[in-house]
Amino acid sequence: MDTLTRFLPEHLQQNQLPEALGGVLLSVVSACTEINAKVRLGALAGVLGMTGTGNIQGEDQKKLDVIANNIMIDTLKANPAVAGLASEEEDTFVSAGENGRYLVLFDPLDGSSNIDVNISVGTIFSILEKPEGALATESFLQTGRQQLAAGYVLYGPQTQLVFTFGHGVYMFTLNAENEFVLTKEKPKVPESTKEFAINMSNRRHWLPPVQQYIDELLAGETGTRGKNYNMRWVASMVAEIHRILMRGGVFMYPQDKRDPAKPGKLRLMYEANPMSLILEQAGASASNAYQAMLDIQPENLHQRVAVFMGSSEEVDYLNRLHSK
């Protein structure tokens, strides 16, 4: 089986991609391998629990949020091809190599609310080309279609790397020698599914189309959908999307009525865009219920969006319900 270091040069050459772009991916992987070691030790290394501070999102930071964020920044800044970084945990962008060609955006530890109870978490990342001119916030505000690469590392029972350069999705598993080994090529998400993932405790806050959709699923084979569905909810986006990539399903984090100023909870640049590119490359769909996720023009680094992604039949149906 191919290791990442053997696979990557061939993949780049076959698809006429720059070697430096592959080098940025390897920097991300190096950082994630270090994060994986911290996650694995947990309480043994004293890295669990809260910091007592909050991030730009207004969320309480876990110790591992900060540790993972610092590892990503330090590792990526050491790569001269990286011009700048943007992190869910940082107020603004971070400048890097003066002559760098690439921008990297990331959620250093997605699902970190689960870390103290030993549930799967992960790192999500996106790579963009730096536009001409001085580095600024606007340099990062590109649509998801402009991503050169996207991926995630899942820290679960196995540590897995999943990424795409826009030429199919590839999955690697970390072995005992700390090498990522190719374990799945070009997975395809089934068009139809009987699984959905949503936080049902928020039902009273949802907009009517989402309430209708979930009611139809819960009605099962006697309802309008004519089949029984199972619900899943891990509260870790990386874990939810990985399951969908492996066997289908639909993941939803809809807008709700509590704060009209927030069109959703998840971040477009750090979470929704990279996951949408991966899923589209695997034959699935992703939207905010009104337009394809990858077509949304971002207005700020920390923009939030409603998220509906997974098996295309379900996402298409959700889009139709919202258009009525």
Curated annotation (Swiss-Prot):
> Sorted alphabetically, which keywords does the UniProt record give?
Carbohydrate metabolism, Cytoplasm, Hydrolase, Magnesium, Metal-binding
This enzyme catalyses: beta-D-fructose 1,6-bisphosphate + H2O = beta-D-fructose 6-phosphate + phosphate
One Gene Ontology cellular component term attached to this UniProt record is: cytosol
Q: What class of enzyme is it?
A: hydrolase
E.C. number: 3.1.3.11
Which terms in the Gene Ontology molecular function aspect does this entry carry?
A: fructose 1,6-bisphosphate 1-phosphatase activity; magnesium ion binding
The cellular location(s) given in this protein's UniProt record come to: Cytoplasm
Q: Which Pfam families match?
A: FBPase (PF00316), FBPase_C (PF18913)
Major localization class: cytoplasm
Q: Per its Swiss-Prot or TrEMBL entry, what cofactor is needed?
A: Mg(2+)
Which pathway is it part of? Carbohydrate biosynthesis; gluconeogenesis
Q: Does the keyword Membrane apply?
A: no
Looking up InterPro entries in the UniProt record yields: FBPase_C_dom, FBPase_class-1, FBPase_N, FBPtase
- Cite the cofactor comment: Binds 2 magnesium ions per subunit.
Q: What does the record list as GO biological process? A: fructose 1,6-bisphosphate metabolic process; fructose 6-phosphate metabolic process; fructose metabolic process; gluconeogenesis; sucrose biosynthetic process
> Which positions does UniProt annotate for Mg(2+) 2 binding?
107, 110, 271
Keyword Metal-binding included in the entry's annotation: yes
Q: Which residues bind substrate?
A: 110-113, 199, 265
Q: Which CDD domains has this protein been placed in?
A: FBPase (cd00354)
Which residues does Mg(2+) 1 bind? Answer: 88, 107, 109
**Family of the protein in this entry:** Belongs to the FBPase class 1 family.
Q: What binding partners and quaternary form does the record give?
A: Homotetramer.
Name of the protein: Fructose-1,6-bisphosphatase class 1
